[in-house]
């Protein structure tokens, strides 16, 4: 437990240092930030014209819930149409830069969707769609990840993983959790096939 605490603290400190810190400046970027999926998503968000400031966008904190991260579409109460999301990384539930990168990729898919489509987070259908996309594109349902969870040998395993993890993500939304499975099934085919900003599932 003590090792886990110090490892989590170390990972988080690498995200909360000032911008002048070499960890946040090339060529010494933290491994989680240099992960290809994270880099591609950050670039895609920028290409859409949405500003990114990692010093304020990424918040590493102790979450005290069974989650690795979260996404806040507008954390400063800005006017409609303004883009100022917050990506939360839960320091108490991550054990290495691989998982930090995976969590960042998941939450950055939400940030991309917010920039591209102005997600209505009150709509269970919009919420389900972005969770399906995040689980599909972040790498959390890759074969090796499912193998480590003991889930393998099933047909369409990737799709089953995406359904399962999207439903888990929707459980934190009081307005949608009772309808999560139903809503996911209604939008699954369309949202699973929407792999933007990638040409296909990476």
Give each language-model segment a name.
Residues 1, 12-68, 82:
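Glycine-rich short-loop/terminal segments
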Residues 36, 93, 120:
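Residue-level detector of functional hotspots within protein domains
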Residues 40-52, 62-86, 98, 115, ...:
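Metalloprotease/metallohydrolase-associated module, dominated by Zn2+-dependent proteases
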Residues 86-89, 94-99, 104:
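Acidic, Ser/Pro-rich intrinsically disordered regulatory regions that embed short linear motifs
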Residues 102-114:
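Active-site recognition of the HExxH zinc-binding catalytic motif
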């Amino acid at each position: 437990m003590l090792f886990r605490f110090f490892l989590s603290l170390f990972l988080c400190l690498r995200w909360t240092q000032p911008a002048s810190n070499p960890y946040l400046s090339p060529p010494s970027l933290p491994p989680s930030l240099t992960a290809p999926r994270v880099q591609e998503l950050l670039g895609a968000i920028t290409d859409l014209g949405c500003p990114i400031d990692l010093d304020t966008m990424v918040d590493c904190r102790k979450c005290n819930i069974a989650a690795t991260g979260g996404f806040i579409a507008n954390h400063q109460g800005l006017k409609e149409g303004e883009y100022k999301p917050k990506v939360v990384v839960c320091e108490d539930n991550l054990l290495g830069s691989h998982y930090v990168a995976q969590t960042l990729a998941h939450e950055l898919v939400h940030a991309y969707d917010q920039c591209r489509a102005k997600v209505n987070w009150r709509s269970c259908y919009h919420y389900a769609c972005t969770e399906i996309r995040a689980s599909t594109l972040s790498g959390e349902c890759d074969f090796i990840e499912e193998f480590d969870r003991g889930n393998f040998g099933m047909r369409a395993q990737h799709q089953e993983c995406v359904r399962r993890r999207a439903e888990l993500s929707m459980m934190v939304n009081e307005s949608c959790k009772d309808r999560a499975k139903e809503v996911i099934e209604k939008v699954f085919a369309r949202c699973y096939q929407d792999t933007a900003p990638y040409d296909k599932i990476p």
